[in-house]
Amino acid sequence: MNLTLKIWRQKDSSSKGQMVDYKVTEISEHMSFLEMIDVLNEGLVAKGEEPVAFDHDCREGICGMCSMYINGEAHGPDRGITTCQLHMRMFNDGDTITIEPFRAAAFPVIKDLIVDRTAFERIQHAGGYISVNTSGNTQDANAIPIAKEAADTAMDAATCIGCGACVATCKNSSAMLFVGAKVSQYALLPQGQVEAADRVKNMVAQMDLEGFGNCTNTGACEVECPKGISLDNIARMNRELMKASV
C-alpha cells in the first residue's frame, strides 16, 4: 500500500515543531507500524536526511516505550495493543496517517516523537514499592497466603506498563489511572498494606507536583489503555487516600 504520513518533527525540547509530510510506498499490510516507520527512515537516511526519532525497545507490547498518537488516538485505531503491536492492515491504501508524540505538559517533547516520561518514574520512586528487610531473616515470599481474588485483581493492576496513553488521551492530562494502578497492585496484597498510607499519600503528592491534571471521570483512559486497566483502580486509590488522610 501507498501512504501519506504527517509526522511531527521537532529538533529538541526548546525548538518549535511542525508537521511534515512524507510518502511511503509498497508497504505490506503485514508490517507492524514501527516497521513501516523503519522503512521511512531507511529512505530518509539514504537521501541524507534526518530520520524520524521515535522511542522503542521490546516491540512486544511490554516496555511501553513506543508511545505515539496516531490519527488522534493513543497507540492508534486498534484496542488492547501498543503502537509496536499495531499492524498496517488496520489502514487502507492511499490513507493519510497523522503521527504525533503524546501531548501533556508533564511529558515534554525531547525530539520528534520522543517525550520525557520520567515524571512517571518519580511517582513510582515516591512509593511504588514494598520495603523488604534483607538482614538475613527475610521471610520466604510465598509464606503469606493471599486470596485468589485479591491476587488476580492485583495482577490486573500490575499489568500497567507505564506507557502514558492514559495521560495522552485524557482531556485534562490526568495520570490517575497510572497512579491508581500502581497503588492498587500493592494495596490489595498483605505485603503492601504495611506501607499503604505513606505510599498513596506520597505517590499522589508527587503526581500533583509533576503537573498532571485532575480526573473528571470521562473514562477515555480506560478505553485507550493498551492493557485495559480499569477505572476501579482510580476509585481504590481515592479510598486509600481517604483512609490515609483521616
Regions found by a protein language model. Give the residues of each.
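Ferredoxin-type iron-sulfur electron-transfer modules in oxidoreductases and energy-metabolism complexes
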Residues: 31-50, 97-246
